[in-house]
Curated annotation (Swiss-Prot):
Organism (species): Xanthomonas oryzae pv. oryzae (strain KACC10331 / KXO85)
Keyword Transferase: yes
A single MF term (Gene Ontology): double-stranded RNA binding
Taxonomic path: Bacteria, Pseudomonadati, Pseudomonadota, Gammaproteobacteria, Lysobacterales
Name of the protein: Threonylcarbamoyl-AMP synthase
GO terms under cellular component: cytoplasm
Family from the record: Belongs to the SUA5 family. TsaC subfamily.
């Protein structure tokens, strides 16, 4: 049976290194505390995703990532584009500092970041007060789940709980753009 988490339960689960599922703008996501290497490695093992690919993090405020990203390294117009798009369904690859953990960035010199306007994600991030991994709740190479009912039972059996809610109206996962160049990396 799937354990449904309140926001307070979700925060406690994340603090303890747990992995949770939650609805996002287009699909169900898996999340954990990106500051805890063991939690991220567990999430990646659940998904069967290589660590070198990196993960997206969501947050309620960009300043909680100040130790990991250097938004001021962007050209002023690019920085304005990024900040003006948030909160919203926009994921940007931001330049990282030397303190950004490789288990989050993978082999990349940037970190994928989104400040979501989705009500569940926004409330979860605000309650959590820290960055949160956001990767689709599916095994690598499989289609992402667009409803809680579509979450694989085998995947649900490996995680610590679910924050209930509905996915947003996007038909596809969020677009990913490089904040330095503006180039679209995933559409």
């Amino acid at each position: 049976m799937t354990h449904i988490l309140t926001l307070d339960n979700a925060v406690a689960t994340l603090t303890q290194g747990g992995v949770i599922a939650y609805p996002t703008e287009a699909v169900w996501g898996l999340g954990c505390d990106p500051r805890q290497e063991a939690a991220v490695l567990r999430l990646l093992e659940i998904k069967r995703r290589p660590v070198d690919k990196g993960v997206i993090v969501v947050t309620s405020r960009v300043d909680v990532l100040r130790d990991w990203v250097d938004i001021d390294a962007l050209a002023p117009a690019r920085r304005q584009d990024v900040l003006a798009s948030w909160p919203g369904p926009h994921t940007w690859i931001l330049p990282v500092t030397a303190r950004a953990p490789r288990w989050v960035t993978g082999e990349h010199d940037g970190l994928a970041v989104r400040i979501s306007a989705h009500p569940v994600v926004a409330a979860l991030c605000a309650a959590w007060g820290a960055p949160l991994v956001s990767t689709s709740a599916n095994l690598a190479g499989e289609p992402p789940a667009r409803s809680r009912a579509a979450l694989e039972p085998a995947l649900l059996a490996t995680i610590d709980g679910v924050v209930d809610g509905e996915v947003g109206a996007l038909a596809q996962p969020t677009r990913i753009r490089d904040a330095r160049s503006g180039q679209i990396l995933r559409d």
